[in-house]
């Protein structure tokens, strides 16, 4: 199978390395200098340093070349750009006049200005594209790059997309499950990043494991309420892309969103934290969208609201936690 991976950040690079072990894989990025470095060293020293990439993996900075590769009869196109760049990439794909027949995206979050999920952006920008879906689940790029075990879910209303994604990714240490709840999978992948900031704050303040467990459990309830209101199914949020991804992102030391929370609790400013990370922390980008959607649906999401207060309203982390503890008692 031919596979084109659009986006050479940490996640796109790790997935391309996995795919290249079994398929004819091409990794694209618009940054020619990044591509030149990949071609010379077979390592993404900018985003995934120390991980050797397969010799068979190919690289190109020409989007037309990548799209032609991913549009072959027996091919799959993987969109690994962040949500913030998804619409622009779709524009470029449409302008290139070569939209692959089968597309799966791996980005997580809501579009900041519109509060749309990735599938809604793709439907608006690539209206004729019918075989598409989302691949998501509890996964750190570095561990995938190291070929450590991982389980992900592909969700699509197209059986052809599910089957092609399964055929592409299900090998080696990667196990793929299938489903059709695109909205539920996307909401889980977006909201868990916001909740991971909350657990990072709690852990950074030294509030203990009991508090962490409470935040994860009550955060899952918030995720599920919003997801169901937006059209997802409740059972999706207890699976890999909901609870599984939340546990990993909220507790794993490789989590950028958890790191943001830890650093906020230590008294660092958000600008300083993001500057030092050098990578995207999607929980920061989509926190306001999550809260806006919750309010539009008349849904209470007190943990997400507390995170927004710390990120954008100048509320001290300890005061935000105190506010959560002062909430009225109620039935679970």
UniProtKB/Swiss-Prot annotation:
SUPFAM superfamilies: 6-phosphogluconate dehydrogenase C-terminal domain-like, NAD(P)-binding Rossmann-fold domains
GO biological process per UniProt: carbohydrate metabolic process; glycerol-3-phosphate biosynthetic process; glycerol-3-phosphate catabolic process; glycerophospholipid metabolic process; phospholipid biosynthetic process
Protein EC: 1.1.1.94
Keywords for the protein's UniProt record, in alphabetical order: Cytoplasm, Lipid biosynthesis, Lipid metabolism, NAD, NADP, Nucleotide-binding, Oxidoreductase, Phospholipid biosynthesis, Phospholipid metabolism
GO-annotated molecular function: glycerol-3-phosphate dehydrogenase [NAD(P)+] activity; NAD binding
Residues that, per the record, bind sn-glycerol 3-phosphate: 108, 137, 139, 192, 245, 255-257
Pathway(s) where this gene product acts: Membrane lipid metabolism; glycerophospholipid metabolism
Record's GO cellular component terms: cytosol
Catalytic reaction(s) noted: sn-glycerol 3-phosphate + NAD(+) = dihydroxyacetone phosphate + NADH + H(+); sn-glycerol 3-phosphate + NADP(+) = dihydroxyacetone phosphate + NADPH + H(+)
InterPro entries: 6-PGluconate_DH-like_C_sf, 6PGD_dom2, G3P_DH_NAD-dep, G3P_DH_NAD-dep_C, G3P_DH_NAD-dep_N, NAD(P)-bd_dom_sf
Localisation: Cytoplasm
Active site: 192 (proton acceptor)
Positions annotated to bind NADPH: 11, 30, 108, 141, 256, 280, 282
Function: Catalyzes the reduction of the glycolytic intermediate dihydroxyacetone phosphate (DHAP) to sn-glycerol 3-phosphate (G3P), the key precursor for phospholipid synthesis.
Family matches, as PANTHER family: GLYCEROL-3-PHOSPHATE DEHYDROGENASE, GLYCEROL-3-PHOSPHATE DEHYDROGENASE [NAD(+)] 2, CHLOROPLASTIC
Protein family per UniProt: Belongs to the NAD-dependent glycerol-3-phosphate dehydrogenase family.
Protein name: Glycerol-3-phosphate dehydrogenase [NAD(P)+]
Species of provenance: Burkholderia cenocepacia (strain ATCC BAA-245 / DSM 16553 / LMG 16656 / NCTC 13227 / J2315 / CF5610)
Gene: gpsA
């Amino acid at each position: 199978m031919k596979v084109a991976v659009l986006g050479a950040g940490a996640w796109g690079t790790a997935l391309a390395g996995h795919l290249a072990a079994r398929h004819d894989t091409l990794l694209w990025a618009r940054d020619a200098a990044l591509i030149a470095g990949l071609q010379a060293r077979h390592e993404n020293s900018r985003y995934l340093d120390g991980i050797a990439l397969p010799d068979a993996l190919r690289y190109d900075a020409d989007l037309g070349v990548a799209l032609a590769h991913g549009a072959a009869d027996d091919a799959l196109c993987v969109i690994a750009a962040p949500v913030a760049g998804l619409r622009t990439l779709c524009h470029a794909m449409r302008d290139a006049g070569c939209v692959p027949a089968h597309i799966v995206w791996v980005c997580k979050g809501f579009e900041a200005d519109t509060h749309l999920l990735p599938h809604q952006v793709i439907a608006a920008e690539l209206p004729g594209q019918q075989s598409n879906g989302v691949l998501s689940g509890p996964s750190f790029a570095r561990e995938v790059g190291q070929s450590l075990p991982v389980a992900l879910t592909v969700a699509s209303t197209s059986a052809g997309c599910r089957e092609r994604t399964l055929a592409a990714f299900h090998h080696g240490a990667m196990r793929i499950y299938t489903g059709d709840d695109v909205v539920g999978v996307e909401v889980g992948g977006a909201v868990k990043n916001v909740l991971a900031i909350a657990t990072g704050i709690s852990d950074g303040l030294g509030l203990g494991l009991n508090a962490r467990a409470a935040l994860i459990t009550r955060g899952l309830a918030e995720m599920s309420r919003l997801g169901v209101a937006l059209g997802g199914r409740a059972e999706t949020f207890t699976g890999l892309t909901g609870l599984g991804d939340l546990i990993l992102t909220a507790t794993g030391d490789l989590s950028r969103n958890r790191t943001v929370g830890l650093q906020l609790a230590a008294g660092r400013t958000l600008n300083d934290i993001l500057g030092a990370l050098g990578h995207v922390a999607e929980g920061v980008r989509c926190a306001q969208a999550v809260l806006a959607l919750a309010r539009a649906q008349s849904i209470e999401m007190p943990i997400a609201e507390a995170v927004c207060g710390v990120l954008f309203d100048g509320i001290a982390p300890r005061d935000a936690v105190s506010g959560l503890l002062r909430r009225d008692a109620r039935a679970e």
